[in-house]
From Swiss-Prot:
It is a multi-pass membrane protein. This is Chlorophyll a-b binding protein 2, chloroplastic. The modification Phosphothreonine is found at T38. It comes from Arabidopsis thaliana (Mouse-ear cress). Chlorophyll b 1 binds at Y58. Residues 1-35 form a transit peptide. Its main location: plastid. Photoregulated by reversible phosphorylation of its threonine residues. The chain crosses the membrane at residues 100-120, 152-172, 221-241. GO terms for molecular function: chlorophyll binding; metal ion binding; mRNA binding. The lineage of its organism: Eukaryota, Viridiplantae, Streptophyta, Embryophyta, Tracheophyta.
Length: 267
């Protein structure tokens, strides 16, 4: 007997393809046929190399078998989870949220570390442009002028700055977690859309799915960049742009290996 496929129009199954096929033993036995249903799993964007079982893997064709729980449903899934951090669905959902949020902060932070130095090197009077030195200006006699302009924000108390940061960032994070704030409600806490997408970049589902991947790829790079900026600040005492300029001027003596050897015992 030929297997049959049908779509149920009941509201409970609306939009889901259901495969109804008899088991072989049932056909060959008494001739009685029992129908089995198989609900198709949701797939990623059609033709996208970043989603689904055939997506790009972390080592390309040498990646091996991916864990069963990494199905390529979510952006940034390259099938790599050696430590099993994503095995638990709740932990996986939480880690996805943390990664996206930290990626966005890292991208903003990396821009904030680099941009003032670029402006200062191109003749813009910026006060202290190096990111880790700028904040310490608040301990000077004159305090800290935002953007080097005393008419904007003239900060003189580190406690006042700390309290302001806690209040403002606490409010923003509270709105994000609750999914409700001055800009309205959000159905998706990670990708709220609406007022947060004034250019309508997420209107097309295919383009939106690809933008999610691009955001995570750039965010992961930004997190590594911020870590590198921290290490540079400790080791060289200079900002990222100045370190880059020194390396380009003398790559032999200004590189990670040369600075690492300075910490060899007895040197």
């Amino acid at each position: 007997m030929a297997a049959s496929t049908m779509a149920l129009s009941s509201p409970a199954f609306a939009g889901k393809a259901v495969n109804l096929s008899p088991a072989a033993s049932e056909v060959l036995g008494s001739g009685r046929v029992t129908m089995r249903k198989t609900v198709a799993k949701p797939k990623g964007p059609s033709g996208s190399p970043w989603y689904g079982s055939d997506r790009v893997k972390y080592l390309g064709p040498f990646s091996g078998e991916s864990p069963s729980y990494l199905t390529g449903e979510f952006p940034g899934d390259y099938g790599w989870d050696t430590a099993g951090l994503s095995a638990d669905p709740e932990t996986f959902a939480r880690n996805r949220e943390l990664e996206v949020i930290h990626s966005r902060w890292a991208m903003l932070g990396a821009l904030g570390c680099v941009f003032p130095e670029l402006l200062a090197r191109n003749g813009v009077k910026f006060g202290e442009a190096v990111w880790f030195k700028a904040g310490s200006q608040i301990f000077s006699d004159g305090g800290l002028d935002y953007l080097g302009n005393p008419s904007l924000v003239h900060a003189q108390s580190i406690l006042a700055i700390w309290a302001t940061q806690v209040i403002l960032m606490g409010a923003v994070e509270g709105y994000r977690v609750a999914g409700n704030g001055p800009l309205g409600e959000a159905e998706d806490l990670l990708y709220p859309g609406g007022s947060f997408d004034p250019l309508g970049l997420a209107t097309d589902p295919e383009a939106f799915a690809e933008l999610k991947v691009k955001e995570l790829k750039n965010g992961r790079l930004a997190m590594f960049s911020m870590f590198g900026f921290f290490v540079q600040a400790i080791v060289t005492g200079k900002g990222p742009i100045e370190n880059l300029a020194d390396h380009l001027a003398d790559p032999v003596n200004n590189n990670a290996w040369a600075f690492a050897t300075n910490f060899v015992p007895g040197k």
